[in-house]
Amino acid sequence: MKAEIFYHKIVAIAAQPPAERRNSLVGLHTEVVTPYLNAVRAMTAQDAGRVSSDNRTLGQVVGHIAEWERFSILAVGEIITGVRWPQIMNLSGYVEPDGQVCEFSSIDAFNDYQASKHAAWSWEQIQNLAIQTAAILQILFAHPSLVSWERLEQTKAYRWQLPNEMSVMVSCGWYLWMVTLEHEAVEHALDLGIVEP
């Protein structure tokens, strides 16, 4: 999806009443995740080894998206249990599969950590993680009893600065959902071949 179209959709969705906003995001999530997953499934190990526009391999870029989605799954668990400011908002509470809890000083520190980790992974491992996390996150957000609009609304307010001096003020639960979609639809779309240059 072209960035301009995506951000205009986000601004329009953010202005909707919460119940309608939730339905719109479920639809946008489906619209965004399908081409992302198609690109991930079609990527070969050779493709994954190519260098992206930010000097990571495409495999590391996909791994990076998957790890942010994994972190978001942890955050959604917190939101479901009533946490108003999930740890992801402070870059803390990231739990490795072995139980190690990590905190990061910056987004770049998180990204560098994941790039180093995925440099040692096979493409098959990264691909499986990406497919699983994208599917799980979509299922969680789409489930109205688990991630209801009321639960998203109860989280603390957050102003998301968008390109071209646009911004939206939503609760951080909504923001986490929207930024997940931005990651799949816009941020790495050119590298993954999801949109034409």
Question: Language-model segments: which ranges?
Answer:
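Domain-scale detector for complete catalytic domains at protein termini or as standalone homologs
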Residues: 26, 30-34, 124-127, 131, ...
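Terminal targeting/low-complexity segments that flank the catalytic cores of oxidoreductases
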Residues: 1-35
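Acidic/His metal-coordination segments adjacent to aromatic residues that form catalytic metal sites
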Residues: 14-22, 108-124, 163-175
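Acidic/histidine-rich alpha-helical segments that form the ligand environment
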Residues: 28, 32, 97-151
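Short, contiguous alpha-helical
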Residues: 1-13, 47-106, 139-197
